[in-house]
């Protein structure tokens, strides 16, 4: 092996679906100022209120999707790590999580001990958001400063419109679409609207008009999560030859009372059923790995909601996970990260 390593970083998971482990994980996640962007005293107060009931509720959700080998997100991420290593001959491929175990610090220390000099950091998020990409990059830089490790760091930029990502998405999802469907819903993770405004380098473009995402100039597009989600959806639809009326975009996983980007997935599930859609396919392109937001929120609760509203079938299309096309594409993306 040579001295150029990859560090794949995903979100993370509790160690188990037990309430205590879920509480510990949620506390670390929600106290990240990039996730809840409030001053520390207010953030601490809000998170303490959330942790009164949320750990028990989330523990039940985690238990419903937990695998014999543990967290699906962790298990699938490990499989991806192994698959990418088969395509990356420049050095070792390491895996870390932003929250919970498999810390970024431990991964960087292992790489340094192996004699690695260069690291390409790959946040496993196709679209940019401070609460995903920025927090991974900043935590990695913090660890490097604090530890004194002299590793040359490169960062994989968001790859929402890169052909490698979209082609892998098409190859992974294609067989599921060929089974037939009435409608395809592309459900992306949501964000509070204030996060978009905060990330807008112009200070005035985001959410300024109904078509702001489609009209976003290059410098705004580079930091606008919603605009990037729409570009990903459109790129995928073109590759699959989907007519405009057969697919749509929504945003899931709202937390709290603040206004989040819309349309909301839970509202779209009811609306599509009311429109007469019987066989609904749902993809979650903001997630490269299946996790609680896909398997439980969409695959269980979303399915129940859609059927209760009059739909017949909701089929959750698996994420990219460790699909061979994705493993190859990710290695190629990391060779040209900028």
Curated annotation (Swiss-Prot):
Source superkingdom: Bacteria
Binding site for Fe cation: 189, 293
Main location as per UniProt: cytoplasm
Enzyme Commission code(s) on record: 4.98.1.1
GO CC, one annotated term: cytoplasm
One GO molecular-function entry: ferrochelatase activity
Record carries keyword Nuclease: no
GO biological process, one term: heme biosynthetic process
Entries under InterPro entries matching the protein: Ferrochelatase (IPR001015), Ferrochelatase_C (IPR033644), Ferrochelatase_N (IPR033659)
A Pfam family it matches: Ferrochelatase
Described purpose of this protein according to its UniProt entry: Catalyzes the ferrous insertion into protoporphyrin IX.
PANTHER family from the UniProt entry: FERROCHELATASE, FERROCHELATASE, MITOCHONDRIAL
NCBIfam families documented for this protein: hemH
HAMAP family listed in its UniProt record: Ferrochelatase (MF_00323)
Family from the record: Belongs to the ferrochelatase family.
Name by which UniProt lists this protein: Ferrochelatase
Organism for this UniProt entry: Azotobacter vinelandii (strain DJ / ATCC BAA-1303)
């Amino acid at each position: 092996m040579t001295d150029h390593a990859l560090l794949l970083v995903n979100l993370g998971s509790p160690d188990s679906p037990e309430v205590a482990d879920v509480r510990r994980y949620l506390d670390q996640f929600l106290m990240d100022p990039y996730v809840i962007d409030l001053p520390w005293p207010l953030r601490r107060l809000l998170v303490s209120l959330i942790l009164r009931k949320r750990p028990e509720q989330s523990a039940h959700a985690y238990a419903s999707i937990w695998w014999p080998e543990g967290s699906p997100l962790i298990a699938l991420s490990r499989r991806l790590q192994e698959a990418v290593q088969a395509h990356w001959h420049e050095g070792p491929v390491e895996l870390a999580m932003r929250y919970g175990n498999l810390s970024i610090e431990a991964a960087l220390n292992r790489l340094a001990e192996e004699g690695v000099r260069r690291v390409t950091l790959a946040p496993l998020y196709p679209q940019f958001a401070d609460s995903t990409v920025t927090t991974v990059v900043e935590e990695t830089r913090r660890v490097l400063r604090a530890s004194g490790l002299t590793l040359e760091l490169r960062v994989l930029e968001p790859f929402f419109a890169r052909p490698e990502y979209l082609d892998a998405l098409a190859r992974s999802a294609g067989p599921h679409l060929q089974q037939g469907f009435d409608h395809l819903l592309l459900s992306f993770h949501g964000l509070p609207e204030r996060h978009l405004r905060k990330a807008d380098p112009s200070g005035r473009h985001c959410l300024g008009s109904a078509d702001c995402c489609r009209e976003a100039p290059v410098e705004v597009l580079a930091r606008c999560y919603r605009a990037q989600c729409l570009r990903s959806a459109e790129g995928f639809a073109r590759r699959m030859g989907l007519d405009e009326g057969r697919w749509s975009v929504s945003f899931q996983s709202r937390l709290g009372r603040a206004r989040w980007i819309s349309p909301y997935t839970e509202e779209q599930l009811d609306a599509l059923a009311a429109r007469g859609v019987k066989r609904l396919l749902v993809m979650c392109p903001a997630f490269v790995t299946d996790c609680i937001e896909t398997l439980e929120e969409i695959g269980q609760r979303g399915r129940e909601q859609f059927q209760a509203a009059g739909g017949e079938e909701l089929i959750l299309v698996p994420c990219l996970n460790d699909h061979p096309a994705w493993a190859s594409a990710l290695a190629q993306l990391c060779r040209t990260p900028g």
